Regions:
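Acidic, low-complexity, intrinsically disordered interaction modules
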Residues: 28-32, 42-65
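Stable alpha-helical structural segments in soluble proteins, enriched in small hydrophobic residues
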Residues: 74, 78-86
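A short, exposed loop/beta-hairpin motif centered on an aromatic-Gly-Thr core
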Residues: 59-77
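A structural detector for beta-sheet-dominated domains
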Residues: 21, 37-41
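Short intrinsically disordered terminal tails
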Residues: 1-2, 87-93
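Short stretches within intrinsically disordered, low-complexity N-terminal or propeptide regions
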Residues: 9, 18, 55-57, 80
């Protein structure tokens, strides 16, 4: 456990370290910048899913709005899943 994890008094507090990433989604109407926030939980509700990534914008807004996200046991898994989700649908904002 990382040192900061000892600040959590109870698992229900869901203490997490936040990592920020940026990516450019390239599409016909121009490039769109997405910020991805990855939370690294001390004690996740699901033991194999320590990392949760979520984009700052929705995609597919005109049909069925979707906020790209991804879970994983590593930061790479969660971040990669979120990037794939961003690229799955067009940004229509």
């Amino acid at each position: 456990m990382k040192e900061w994890g000892f600040a959590q008094a109870h698992p229900n507090e869901e203490l997490a370290e936040i990592h920020l990433f940026s990516m450019m989604k390239q599409q016909a109407g121009g490039d769109i910048e997405f910020t991805i926030k990855v939370k690294e939980y001390v004690t996740p509700k699901e033991p194999t899913m320590h990392f949760f990534a979520q984009a700052d914008k929705e995609t597919n807004q005109k049909t069925a709005p979707y906020r790209p996200s991804g879970w994983g046991k590593t930061m790479l898994e969660a971040l990669s899943e979120c990037v794939r989700a961003i690229n799955r649908f067009p940004y229509e904002g």
